[in-house]
Amino acid sequence: MGFVVPPYPHDRLNAGRTRAAERWGSAIDLSIGTPCDPPPAAVVEALSTSNTERGYPTSLGSPRYRGAAAGWLARRLGSIVDPATEVAACIGTKEFVATTPQFLKLRTPERDTVLYPAVAYPTYAMGAALAGCRAVGVPVDNAWRLDLSAIDPADAARALCLWVNTPGNPAGGLDDLEAAATWGRTNGVTVLSDECYAEFTWDGPPRSILAHGTEGVLAVHSLSKRSNLAGMRAGYASGVKPAHEPRI
């Protein structure tokens, strides 16, 4: 039969959305985090005046783009990274989430498991499926935080990566990022921190896993949520020297 693409979870909601509209006339759709506010005026202006700027970008992103990303991380999260060696552009972080297990498996073919929060964004499991890997949900506690102590040692030994997402989608849990980084280093597992909601906090400063060092971790950032630029397919990863890790 070969590989059969599994149905995307959002598509499975279409029937329920239709039934709700038929019964009540409309539905409050919480299935996807599409921003409803306008993008920053400066971005709209820049896009409207860039129609003559065409060309293929470098695979890692231009030095200007990576420098801007590193500057944002420093200003907003207090994370200091080297834009030349610790930042890489990605064409949308959803694509990064969905494809990274494939590249990690090329590097470490003896491992075949993707760990991710049991209550989470569906693309973590989808990325595992596309790579031919096992998708293993890590239990969360009553506050929706990742319970690292619940990871089966057998799964840890087979893990390519561990996804963390804080504040978490959809429940808003706040993970212990230092504990996640330490767990990854102890078990030789790359920790991928999806930080697209990092600034969505009720109080207190936003947090990044990069505050606990770049060894063995990658922080993934998107412009879709925090800048109301969904569909622009712009993001970047920062951490374990991605510029020197061509397979990541």
Which residue ranges define each predicted feature?
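N-terminal small-domain helix-loop-helix segment of the aminotransferase-like
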Residues: 2-95
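Helix C-cap/helix->beta junction micro-motif
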Residues: 20, 24, 131, 186-187
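PLP-dependent aminotransferase-like
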Residues: 102-166
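A short helix->loop->beta-strand "cap" motif at the edges of active sites that frequently abuts
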Residues: 112, 186-189, 215
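Hydrophobic/aromatic ligand-binding patch that stacks against planar heteroaromatic rings
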Residues: 127-128, 183, 209
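Active-site phosphate-binding strand-loop segment of PLP-dependent enzymes
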Residues: 142-203
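Conserved core segment of the aminotransferase class I/II
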Residues: 213-248
